[in-house]
Amino acid sequence: VGSEMCIRDRPQNLETSSVNSPAFNTFLAAQINLNCNSLLMKGTKVSDLITISGDVHHIFPRNYLKKNGIDNKTKYNQVANYIYLDTQVNKAIGDDPPSVYFAKVQEQCGTKAITLGNISDEEMLYRNLEENSIPQNIVSMDISDYESFLQERRKLMAKLMQRYYQEL
């Protein structure tokens, strides 16, 4: 059964805007099963946010995309652009593009003065990106990178799901 699921959960199955899609829900199940931390929060698990009080956040914020000409709902609401976030982290990010809010996190890794989430060193940041299936170059991405980001994230999400299936 597991290998059959792997065949179905290819990156192209994540080309959807439906949070109810089987592929997206399998990705969330994988994050829960693998005990993944939520984005920018060491110690706050994805499972905590799903069961208690997390927000579904757009990695490239919806208003940022709209202001930059991506105003098609199915384009900005791609599940590859979704991540569960702690409510306070979501509010702190606001409509900032990834290049801005990840620059803040990188700065706090150097200064140790926490202003966004609780990640305080770069190694921890890159591990956190990996467990959330986010490409490492997100730290410098802007609107021109959105389509390539979606493609790369779908591949990383599918890879995490495959790891989940192999561990079942």
Where do the protein language model's features map onto the residues?
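Short, small-residue-biased leader/transition segments that mark boundaries at the very start
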Residues: 1-6
